[in-house]
Amino acid sequence: MNIFNEDDDFLVSTPRDNYFSISKNANQNIVEMEFEKMLERLAVSEKILEDMGLEEDLEKMLRAMRATQENDLKDRVNRLFLELAGNIVTQC
């Protein structure tokens, strides 16, 4: 008899799954605040790239990573999901 629900086991789910589970159950004000902080970071990053004339390079790199460096891209996205989930959990 297994007393643990495998769907609840954070060790078998992905960072993406964990984030969405946490974001659905956490205080929505905190979730929204952390999401907005992440978008602010993205906006500043884009501004820096624009100021340096690198916005086209960003699109090229994104296409290249999707095509040839998929694991690296997934790892980077997973780190962002982990960061968001951690920021939410530490405030609840």
What does each of the following model-derived ranges do?
Residues 1-7, 12-18, 22, 82-92:
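Short, functional C-terminal segments
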Residues 9-60:
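Long, leucine- and charge-enriched amphipathic alpha-helices
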Residues 57-92:
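Charged low-complexity stretches with an acidic bias
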